[in-house]
Amino acid sequence: MEELQDVQLTEIKPLLTDKDPGQHFEDFDGQEHDIETALGVVHVTMSGNTRGNRPVLLTYHDIGLNHKSCFNSFFNFDDMHEITQHFAVCHIDAPGQQQGAPSFPTGYQYPTMDELAEMLTAVLTHLNLRSIIGIGVGAGAYVLSRFALNNPLLVEGLVLLNIDPCAKGWIDWAASKLSFWTTNVVEVVLGHLFGYEELQSSLDLVQTFRLHIAQDINQDNLELFVNSYNSRKDLEIERPVFGSSTPTNTTIKCPVLLVVGDNSPAVDAVVECNSRLDPTRTTLLKMADCGGLPQVVQPGKLAEAIKYFVQGMGYMPSASMTRLVRSRTHSASSSGSMEIPRSRSHTSNAQLKSSSNNSLSNQIQETPQTIELSC
């Protein structure tokens, strides 16, 4: 078996190094909507114009965040402009999580995670959106996955960061309940967003998000959202059995790009999700030297990966191929799934220089793989 060789990436744009990343939370130009659904009101920010039959990029944030703190530094990054000039963007804020949201009345029943997914149908209908490419983080990745399972014709692709497809077990559920009694919700959320190493070393970044969660997010509403996420059901997705005459209806039908940082607390959950998805439509991207917020810490690399992913779907054919040095990786298992470097797969080299015409997007569509980004 050949030794795995790490993918190297030439960094042209600097990573987010500002001591106050919160300055990047400012919103870009967009039209805000409060959309009534049968399950409550959804706050939506729409940017750009829809283009014929082209899908819209639809984002959904994680617990403790809203669309501004989760995605604005990413979508304001220069490299993302090459993508957003081709697509309209629709940012979803989970109920009560937008900046300045009032508290829900006493006794309010917050939507379940499945109901949050149902609410997206009304959003698409209201905005006359025909299909989406979803970009979700954590809880938002779960919501978009559930939506894709229920509405496969409306979802052309998914970029899922830090997804956990599993329901919490009784022990984990009890531990999360206990943590609310012994720890404030801000610290609970920080433990979800950041790995132990980040909490100890990335003090400026963690403090920025600590202040944001404590000051910009309604604490009562946040606790309801966290409880909803912790009470989620298992997605019950199953990897298709190749050669079987009975197709499974419990798998995501569209192409999926799974993303996780190697220091993220969600690594094991993302690998578990990868093992359940169709390997012919799924790519697992693990970022080295990155924790729980790849879109904040490594925006250039994530933007490049999304560009290749979207090109593999047949969009943006003329966009430039600039930075990645690629390594074509093949599955070491008979099922075709890829594992993260803790369980090394074998690799054959195929370098992509900036002058090369070869596209990683073709590789993404051809075979399941793990791409390890190093900086």
Swiss-Prot record:
Residues 364-375 have a biased composition (Polar residues). Gene3D superfamilies: alpha/beta hydrolase. InterPro entries: AB_hydrolase_fold, NDRG. Disulfide bonds: none annotated. GO terms for cellular component: cytoplasm. It comes from the Eukaryota. Residues 348-363 have a biased composition (Low complexity). Residues 326-375 are annotated as: Disordered. Pfam families: Ndr. GO terms for biological process: signal transduction. Belongs to the NDRG family. This is Protein NDRG3. It comes from Xenopus laevis (African clawed frog).
